[in-house]
Amino acid sequence: MVETRVRAKDIVKKTVISEETGRRFGVVGNVDFITESGELLNIIVIEPTVHLKDLNLKADEKGRYLIPFSAVKSIGDYVIVSENELV
């Protein structure tokens, strides 16, 4: 498996879309990561849509929704996530 490095600045402000349904979930506001290793843990979503709110995901201390980075399938013009891995 090829490991690809992703920088937080490359995904901030990109729209988050469901791989399965094409539904828009919101916009990447920031990422949560481990400082020592640089491992990305979660995408922090701002401007959440009703579709994202319906998934009852974990939220941070500011009430922003967290999408585990393990659910991210691809990053390009959009951040594509597997909705099946969120429920």
Where are the predicted features?
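Peripheral interaction segments used for macromolecular assembly
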Residues: 1-87
